[in-house]
């Protein structure tokens, strides 16, 4: 997408950002960030940067311009990917009222364009970690996410705007179902020999049971204590500012969800993003449990003292639900290859990840009677 930035508008934005309305604009440039959009409501990300002059002194500045694209298929405010949600989140002021340990980038301007796209002019943020996080850094970040979510159970008012998604995961599952022909529920789909070494012998029965009970898992998630969630909180969108504060970008999925879902979403995305990382994570229950313990510790720091099983259910159910997308795709891809020699190590690793996700869903099912039959803590 080609864009044309108005210098007159840019001057106003830079002056506002610098809190200096006498600044004069110097040289500047606008360059598209080398990033492939994974969301069809994002038309592009641009870095706009340059110098400004104040009393003959040069001041360097930079901004991020995010182009939001209208999408008919995501025009329902309760659709998980409602195209205008992030714009409304900034305009409403909700993102300026977050608990102290987390903040969104400052929004300098919202511009509606003649082509019906909307431009978000945002503060450029950086972190203090770098590209690769250590296990300890993951724990520190999820502790902050626990404090963020837990704050809404301990005095911070829960927003109720109509455009906040109240059933993000259920909407996502419904969208995924549009691309699933259900063939994986038939025994025939699993009969090719190469599948026998990739999955446990009882995988068909177990997956069918998951598919049968997933509606109950979603119902259980609705029973959990309700909190404000980012819903896309994982390393590319999180910028730690030390041990006690965090900047989160990309609030397009912000909504109301159950306690624990934030962590389940992070964990599921982590497994999906990098096979090397995922393969290591999926075979290390200590990492999973350390993340969960850190998240619960953050909730406790916020002041919530409820039953941790509710949190564990939120985590395992929301992460495990991802197997309903992953397994059908894998079986389809493997059936196309037929020959075991054509299967890559990556594909084999993804099969292990899929089984791990299914195991999480099964753990959630064991907790389900307590969740559906108990009182919210």
How should each PLM-predicted stretch be described?
Residues 1-115, 241-246, 260, 368-377:
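Conserved NTP-binding catalytic cores of kinases and kinase-like/nucleotidyltransferase enzymes
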Residues 29, 319-377:
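C-terminal amphipathic "assembly/sorting" segment characterized by alternating charged
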Residues 61, 118, 226-227:
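Residues on conserved beta-strands of the protein kinase catalytic domain
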Residues 88, 260-303, 320-339:
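Active-site activation/catalytic loop segments of kinase-like enzymes and analogous catalytic loops
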Residues 106, 112, 156-169, 305-312:
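Short, glycine/acidic-rich hinge or "gate" loops at secondary-structure transitions
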Residues 117-127:
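Conserved short submotifs of the Hanks-type protein kinase catalytic core
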Residues 125-147, 154-230, 339-347, 356-359, ...:
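ATP-dependent phospho-/nucleotidyl transfer catalytic cores
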Residues 235-272:
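Catalytic activation segment of kinase domains across protein kinase-like and atypical kinase folds
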